[in-house]
């Protein structure tokens, strides 16, 4: 097939019925987020590479390009960092807590995972300036309700704490390279890869578990 008729690697078209179903879910989520008090913001599809690197993501997963001034840009691969940049620059004097939502495409290059999309669609919220059990409970409740309005019935919500895994890696004096591999596997939810990394480190059973 001519390249002129193909979509780029990891992307897809939506036919009318698919586009309508996608839009219906987006509208339901937008309505739900607003009911919980989250206002929508829109950030640029591309950011400066240095901005996106703050999140600690794997740079090789980013779609990068140069602007006319030879500055390196990248398509956003998640929205937490762009929203943090937005809040720091445009909403820094706003009263807390800030409740913001988004609904956009995100881009991650998956070279060795042909079954995975490189462009996918992400809707979510950011709750800034609230760090208590009620805030945590609200986010969990909203996550569950979001899955329900999207049409899912049988699901499991997994909770994690990044400081726990960071502390465990520090306690075992892991090298920066190994830490990066572990974080990458966790970010991708690649349990098989994570188990291989941990097995190769020969941890004591308690630490490995």
Give residue ranges: language-model regions.
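Extended, charged alpha-beta segments that form solvent-exposed binding/catalytic grooves
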Residues: 1-81, 85-209
């Amino acid at each position: 097939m001519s390249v002129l008729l193909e979509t780029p690697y990891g992307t897809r078209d939506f036919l009318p019925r698919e586009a309508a179903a996608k839009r219906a879910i987006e509208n339901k989520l937008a309505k739900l987020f607003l009911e919980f008090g989250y206002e929508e913001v829109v950030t640029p599809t591309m950011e400066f590479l240095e901005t996106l690197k703050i999140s600690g993501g794997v740079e090789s997963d980013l779609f990068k390009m140069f602007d006319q001034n030879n500055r390196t840009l990248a398509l956003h691969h998640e929205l937490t960092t762009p929203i943090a940049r937005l809040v720091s620059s445009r909403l820094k004097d706003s009263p807390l807590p800030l409740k913001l939502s988004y609904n956009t495409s995100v881009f991650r290059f998956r070279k060795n995972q042909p079954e995975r999309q490189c462009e996918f669609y992400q809707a979510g919220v950011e709750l800034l300036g609230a760090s208590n059990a009620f805030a945590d409970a609200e986010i969990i409740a909203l996550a569950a309700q979001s899955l329900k309005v999207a049409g899912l019935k049988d699901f499991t919500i997994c909770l994690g704490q990044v400081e726990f895994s960071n502390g465990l890696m520090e306690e075992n004096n892991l090298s920066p390279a190994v830490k990066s591999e572990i974080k990458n596997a966790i970010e991708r939810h690649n349990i098989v890869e994570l188990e291989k990394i941990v097995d190769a480190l020969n941890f004591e059973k308690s630490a490995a578990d």
